[in-house]
Amino acid sequence: MYFGLSEEQAFFQDNVKKFLEDQASLDVIRRIVAGEGDDLQKEIHQGLINLGLNSLLIPEEYGGLELDLLFAAAVSEGLGSGIAPIPFIGSYVMAPLAIMHGGNDAQKEHYLNKISANQVRFGIGLTEYIAAREDAGVEITGNKVNGRALFAIDGDNATHFIL
């Protein structure tokens, strides 16, 4: 039994790696960190969106590629081979999975299409579910969330949050 990546998965992963090598050199990342490269960061993000990173797991009916978690793992490894100043795990893996498995039909239609079109990016707040931190706490009353979470995956780029 073969446990490696398929040809398609390896090809996708290699494209991500090559893109980062070409577009996100250490000098570019230093400029972004120094606050001189907001446009550069947006260009890198858009380039990776053009490769389909935002719609890997989303079903085709919602504008996605309908690939599997192994593709997402291969892409994650490709992103990890360089420096990728973009949201990925929260916005493009965890959020689509949560919506696909926990959302109603209207939520799936609304949010999965918007993720595929790069109109929304999700942050994921899980730590309060596991254990509250000192000086933090999130309370949900009815349809309102109030409080402070100390950690949210992809929170700095989020337009929406899943708690």
Name each region found by the language model.
Residues 1-8:
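Intrinsic disorder at enzyme termini
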Residues 25:
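Gly-rich Lys/Arg/Thr-decorated short loops/hinges at beta-loop-alpha junctions or inter-strand turns
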Residues 39-53:
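Active-site-flanking structural segment that lines cofactor/substrate pockets
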Residues 49-109, 113, 117-118, 154-157:
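Internal helix-loop-helix
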Residues 9, 20, 52, 59, ...:
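Buried hydrophobic positions in well-ordered alpha/beta secondary-structure cores of metabolic enzymes
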Residues 14:
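Conserved "HGTGT" condensation-loop signature of ketosynthase/thiolase-family condensing enzymes
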Residues 28-36:
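C-terminal helix-coil-helix/basic helical segment that borders enzyme active sites and/or dimer interfaces
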Residues 64-65, 105-163:
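Glycine-rich, Trp-frequent "lid" loop and neighboring beta-strands that shape
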